[in-house]
Amino acid sequence: MGNLFMLWAALGICCAAFSASAWSVNNFLITGPKAYLTYTTSVALGAQSGIEECKFQFAWERWNCPENALQLSTHNRLRSATRETSFIHAISSAGVMYIITKNCSMGDFENCGCDGSNNGKTGGHGWIWGGCSDNVEFGERISKLFVDSLEKGKDARALMNLHNNRAGRLAVRATMKRTCKCHGISGSCSIQTCWLQLAEFREMGDYLKAKYDQALKIEMDKRQLRAGNSAEGHWVPAEAFLPSAEAELIFLEESPDYCTCNSSLGIYGTEGRECLQNSHNTSRWERRSCGRLCTECGLQVEERKTEVISSCNCKFQWCCTVKCDQCRHVVSKYYCARSPGSAQSLGKGSA
């Protein structure tokens, strides 16, 4: 039962707010082939890896992949079709494929191993395929069986979710690296043997975050949709999601600005959020987080000084311990706060 709970926790809770029954893991476990229970722990770890990467990628965004929002009720009216939804589906699907592929190459499953289908073939000038390529075909197949099988709808939102699931899996392939080993007399490297390996998961997260920033909004023909709502409609034409955009993230609805709290929609606003200011070793995007999270949402940046205790003046003593002093120093942290004695100014476009 522990593995089943992990899977439900990683996929069911994390994604319930975004696609209702589409992410009902219990439905899959009841109706899915029993053989797939072999992979439930890896699927759970993959989905959790996706959510953790989501939190990293959006740490300094107004929407920061919040736990509470992901545990929101699955009532249909709360199902969104925003670009944030698209990222959740893509990174979760990619995470499952990634971990399954890793475990396969490590020999954790009896029915799969390295992909040697191209071994011995010429790959390019001076190199041939060989070694142990990561078996992405297997990882993709299991990810698709688990994740896509949870999407029961036939409407525009369901097609959007399935598209973004696939875009996530394509991201795993797109970020793979070719690794080579030299062969030849005295290390001359006259020929190389090469194989494909998964990139670091962070690199794939960066890749999908760039896709999120450039996500495509799909304008549906409302005459072919029921109730005039693009996310709730049916009779969605197959050509609505163009094959030429198969690797892109797509969405149907514009996002709110996420400045203002709206708990019924799982939006918790930016009041109280930490931001970075004058920090070293940070990107320009991170350094601008105080403006994005606070100022642009009608909040002020509040400095709070905190005393931190850390080890210092450490010395090695024979044998064999390290002795350290406990040093105290004050650090400044910055948070979004309302101006004293005034009401919060609402960000435009709030939910």
Curated annotation (Swiss-Prot):
One Pfam family hit: wnt
Keyword Amino-acid biosynthesis annotated: no
Function per UniProt: Ligand for members of the frizzled family of seven transmembrane receptors. Plays a role in embryonic patterning.
InterPro entries given in the database record: Protein_Wnt-8A/8C, Wnt, Wnt8, Wnt_C, Wnt_CS
Family: Belongs to the Wnt family.
Keywords: Developmental protein, Disulfide bond, Extracellular matrix, Glycoprotein, Lipoprotein, Secreted, Signal, Wnt signaling pathway
Record's protein name: Protein Wnt-8a
Domain of life: Eukaryota
Naturally occurring in which organism (per UniProt): Homo sapiens
Signal peptide: 1-24
GO biological process, any: neural crest cell fate commitment
Gene assigned in the entry: WNT8A
Keyword NAD applies: no
Disulfide bonds, paired cysteine numbers: 54-65, 104-112, 114-132, 180-194, 182-189, 259-297, 275-290, 294-336, 312-327, 314-324, 319-320
Compartments (UniProt record): Secreted, Extracellular space, Extracellular matrix; Secreted
Species classification: Eukaryota, Metazoa, Chordata, Craniata, Vertebrata
